[in-house]
Amino acid sequence: MAHRNKVMQSINAPDGSLCVDIFLRPDGSFGFDEFRRDPEDPNGWYSIGHYGATVFKTQQDAEAEAERVVVWLSQL
């Protein structure tokens, strides 16, 4: 299945193993999710936050909530 969401911002942890994507949905709402990748796993990034279903009216609201719930992101 193709992804329909457009990533507006992708923020990587300093070690490169984690990231948070802030995205825009086709309906105009925003969301975010946290992802992890392991160097030994050729499948790439996978969701570990499971925040992707939460809906925000603005990109700024999604960013603020991501910073609140993703510990490493709030420490950058």
State the predicted function of each range.
Residues N12-P14, L24, I48:
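A generic structural signal for short, solvent-exposed coil/turn residues
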Residues M1-A2, E40-L76:
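Mixed-charge, Lys/Arg-enriched low-complexity segments
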Residues V7-S10, S29, V55:
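Residue-level preference for alpha-helix termini and adjacent loops
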Residues V20-Y46:
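A short, structured beta-strand/loop element
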